[in-house]
């Protein structure tokens, strides 16, 4: 399960192909579970978008 502070890599974001391959840090998980972070203006939607936690 992803949490605030995790580094993630976006594999696929529905309707936003330019985000594929971007990495960023999770800054906020909102009340409906969307994941916001440093990769740009769009939130990730669990069970729709694909991403992985990057282990450092």
Describe the residue ranges of each PLM region.
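Basic/aromatic-rich interaction segments and small domains that mediate binding to polyanionic partners
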Residues: 3-56
């Amino acid at each position: 399960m992803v949490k605030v502070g995790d580094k993630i890599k976006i594999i696929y974001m529905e309707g936003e192909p330019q985000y594929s391959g971007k990495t960023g840090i999770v800054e906020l998980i909102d009340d409906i579970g969307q994941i916001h972070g440093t990769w740009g203006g769009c939130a990730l939607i669990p069970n729709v978008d694909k991403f992985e936690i990057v282990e450092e």
